[in-house]
Amino acid sequence: MSPPKRFQINAKNYFLTYPRCSLTKEEALSQIRNFQTPTNPKFIKICRELHENGEPHLHVLIQFEGKYKCQNQRFFDLVSPTRSAHFHPNIQGAKSSSDVKSYIDKDGDTWRWGTFQIDGRSARGGQQSANDAYAAALNSGSKSEALKILRELAPRDYLRDFHHISSNLDRIFTKPPPPYENPFPLSSFDRVPEELDEWFHENVMGRARPLRPKSIVIEGDSRTGKTMWSRALGPHNYLCGHLDLSPKVYNNDAWYNVIDDVDPHYLKHFKRIHGGPEDWQSNTKYGKPVQIKGGIPTIFLCNPGPNSSYKEFLDEEKNSALKAWALKNATFISLEGPLYSGTNQGPTQSC
């Protein structure tokens, strides 16, 4: 008769099951971390599970830095801190640490230490496994959680297509900015010039977009209330200092745009923004072109003087043709004073 087979497991990942183990997850982790092995542990995950008869079990995944050869069946035994009791586990080498991690995650009562190490078996299983991985990512609720899931369950796609995956998740999980709340109601602006009021009622029409609306350029000194008035007319895009038409900032459902303190010499898409055409594209610096629904007017706010005034910009000799076009597609107003009376307005917004 052949001698009994000697116990030996040589693996990088270990799956341990402790039946009828009364230790807490924290107590078990503390003891496991004190095991002396020639290769260091990189990740430990513990799940406490109650069986139907009420007996507690512990499931443990240990990932080592390199392969560890275990020849002692009692090496992973745990000891009760309150009574003379040892807890001996069933010991297995984990061929797929991702599968073991998913298994012990199922009950939710888990504790972890270290950083999970991705294994090459994570994405095995063909198209259905890939679909499951991407479904889990979409259901995760955030870009960061989705990336963690794909890094573990679809490592090949994660490494090969990270740029595209990251860009797509930005679009999927980008939350629209909260609606702007103007501290001053529109009725508090009691010195609005008639021409400005007429422009508002003729061109800002909500979702029912006018056919080729006219934009408006409002030039005036600082603290005249032009920014606050412009932002009190309805849902809008507010772009200050520079033009950012990325989905994180620009909302295609806005009623109008407000462009504040942007040097006209560096205003990209001058005609498209002034003229209000529908459906045009803009190239973003680090992403794919974005589709702009258009068909809405724009309020341009500026101060007098070079590098700010649109009038002075259009009066430059080289811009004579652009000026002729702009005068047909926009109204130009110079403010003579504040758009409100009294001191109840308080400080006005400054870009």
Swiss-Prot record:
Lineage top rank: taxon? Viruses
Its EC number is: 2.7.7.-, 3.1.21.-
Keywords, sorted A to Z: ATP-binding, Covalent protein-DNA linkage, DNA replication, DNA-binding, Endonuclease, Helicase, Host nucleus, Host-virus interaction, Hydrolase, Metal-binding, Multifunctional enzyme, Nuclease, Nucleotide-binding, Nucleotidyltransferase, Transferase
Transferase recorded as keyword: yes
Q: Which residues form the CRESS-DNA virus Rep endonuclease domain?
A: 8-116
One GO BP annotation is: DNA replication
Specify where it is mainly localized.
host cell
Q: Name one Pfam family in it.
A: Gemini_AL1_M
| Active site residues according to the UniProt entry | 103
The UniProt annotation puts motif RCR-2 at 57-59
For this chain's record, the cofactor binding note is:
Divalent metal cations, possibly Mg(2+) or Mn(2+).
Compartments reported by the entry: Host nucleus
Q: Where is this region: Binding to RBR1?
A: 143-153
GO molecular-function terms, A-Z: ATP binding; DNA binding; endodeoxyribonuclease activity, producing 5'-phosphomonoesters; helicase activity; metal ion binding; nucleotidyltransferase activity; structural molecule activity
Its required cofactor(s), as named, are:
Mg(2+); Mn(2+)
**Can you tell me which residues bind a divalent metal cation?**
49, 57, 59, 107
Q: What is known of its domains?
A: There are 3 rolling circle replication (RCR) motifs. RCR-2 is probably involved in metal coordination. RCR-3 is required for phosphodiester bond cleavage for initiation of RCR.
Q: What is this protein called?
A: Replication-associated protein
Q: What species is this protein from? A: Indian cassava mosaic virus (ICMV)
